[in-house]
Amino acid sequence: METSLSGIRVGMISLGCSKNLVDSEIMLGKLLEAGAVLTASPHQADILLINTCGFILPAKKESIDTILAAIHRRTTTSKKQKIVVSGCLYQRYGKELSALLPEVDLFLGLDDIPKIDLYVKQLIDTPPSSKEMPALNFSPRFIPDFEHPRLKLTPSHFGYLKIAEGCNHPCTFCIIPRIRGRYRSRTIQNVVAEAEAMIRRGTKEIILVSQDTTFYGRDLSNGQSSLLVDLLDSLETLEGDFWIRLLYTHPAHWNASLIEKFSTSKKIAKYIDIPIQHISNPVLERMQRKTEESYIRELLAEMRTKIKNAAIRTTLIVGFPGESEEDFQKLCSFVSSFKFDRLGVFPYSAEEGTKAEKMNGQVPEIVKKRRAKKIMELQKEIAKEKNKELVGKTLKVLVDYPGVARTEWDCPDVDALVHVPYHLPPGHFTEVKIVDFKEYDLIAR
């Protein structure tokens, strides 16, 4: 039976990562397919959908603050707006959140995403006194599908393609497996069909995301091996001039065939996103990262040798329980010597429900922040060195907005920018000459 939401104005506030953004796009696609219309002004919406993040404390605080601000705005304007909350925060806290925020009209879990149009229609038609929330499935099975309608929230020339959902890793600092469930892959055919549709709509950059892209397909092959290279082979056969960018690769699952694929492909961006988290063995062991220092060093060295002109990006955690000054100095030394092309660092966040939260040796907040600052000071100097080497070179860039572009070494909203002449058209590749730089960004003409 078709659901009619004709004329209902829907607003969206999407928080958190690119994977959550894909969920937001699917929910909007379902609502618009049912007749709703999108408004860019949350206060004008009949239905305000807030898709939350619940990963670490700052993200949880942002989600709660956003919900409270929406409730306050509705109260002060006397608007009969319905507030719908979805995403990781609710999936993680369930009844606790609904008890804390009774003003929210509807909470939706991950498995409710494909049925959001039905729940919103029911919300509109049901008197407030008899509202009933859908039962929350704490072992979600939802996987994005090519058949799901989707309203892209990114510029038309790039988009995120979620190839899998969930995670099987036992990292002691992370709550994601508890929130998102076990790893479950889409089929190669399903992913390729969506990529084809994106290219037909003018997409120039397809960004593959999941909790661990290098784990892709292991659940489809009884855990024997990843199917990521097979997926990349299929995507490379698609016609058109576009980049394929991979995010969230796990160092434990890289292999020779994947390195070979990166080194020979003409469509895969020479951009390796590989969060190592740390280099000290005692810390890696407590994190349960399934890697060790010697393996990480050898893998990164092999990448540098075999994948020419690649940018290697990593993410680090400092202040993990038990991280000694010696552990931290080893990390600093490694960052200084290896010279990552792109790097991000997070002070450890103790998350309830994780093994690390209960570990001895919790590091004071002031020490965590000082260590994170030190790492970024090192990286800033490295970035200046690398940018200085690019002055005078001609690079291919993708123009995002008037005056702003990116190289294949830069992911949207995460990495550096190239400042280009304003007349260059957004959504197109072009070549520019680098004439200067400022810290992380390049300046071109």
UniProtKB/Swiss-Prot annotation:
GO molecular function: 4 iron, 4 sulfur cluster binding; aspartic acid methylthiotransferase activity; metal ion binding; protein methylthiotransferase activity
Domain MTTase N-terminal span(s) in chain numbering: 8-125
Entries under SMART domains matching the protein: Elp3
Residues annotated as binding [4Fe-4S] cluster 1: 17, 53, 88
Catalytic activity: L-aspartate(89)-[ribosomal protein uS12]-hydrogen + (sulfur carrier)-SH + AH2 + 2 S-adenosyl-L-methionine = 3-methylsulfanyl-L-aspartate(89)-[ribosomal protein uS12]-hydrogen + (sulfur carrier)-H + 5'-deoxyadenosine + L-methionine + A + S-adenosyl-L-homocysteine + 2 H(+)
Claim: 4Fe-4S is one of the keywords in the record: yes
Ranges for domain TRAM: 388-445
Enzyme class: transferase
Function: Catalyzes the methylthiolation of an aspartic acid residue of ribosomal protein uS12.
Family per similarity comment: Belongs to the methylthiotransferase family. RimO subfamily.
Full protein name: Ribosomal protein uS12 methylthiotransferase RimO
Species of origin: Methylacidiphilum infernorum (isolate V4) (Methylokorus infernorum (strain V4))
Lineage: Bacteria, Pseudomonadati, Verrucomicrobiota, Methylacidiphilae, Methylacidiphilales
Protein's gene: rimO
